[in-house]
UniProtKB/Swiss-Prot annotation:
Top enzyme class: hydrolase
Location of this chain's protein in the cell: Secreted, Extracellular space
Keyword set includes Secreted: yes
GO cellular component: extracellular region
Keywords: Carbohydrate metabolism, Chitin degradation, Glycosidase, Hydrolase, Multifunctional enzyme, Polysaccharide degradation, Secreted
Domain of life: Eukaryota
Family annotation (PANTHER family): ACIDIC ENDOCHITINASE, ENDOCHITINASE
A Gene Ontology biological process term: chitin catabolic process
InterPro entries registered for this protein in UniProt: Glyco_hydro18_cat, Glycoside_hydrolase_SF, Glycosyl_Hydrlase18_Chitinase
Source species of the chain: Parthenocissus quinquefolia (Virginia creeper)
UniProt protein name: Bifunctional chitinase/lysozyme
Protein task: Bifunctional enzyme with lysozyme/chitinase activity.
Length: 47
């Protein structure tokens, strides 16, 4: 079990660090992860 949250482009959500540090969520789904895998540096689009 556990609670999951969808974190992404809304500036009112706070930072990813703040979200993780609440201790409320077992899983944090990161929205708009547009570059990943194949040795690439992960990149998120927060525009």
């Amino acid at each position: 079990g556990g609670i999951a949250i969808y974190w992404g482009q809304n500036g009112n959500e706070g930072t990813l660090t703040q979200t993780c540090n609440t201790g409320k969520y077992s899983y944090v789904n990161i929205a708009f992860l547009n570059k990943f895998g194949n040795g690439q540096t992960p990149e998120i689009n927060l525009a």
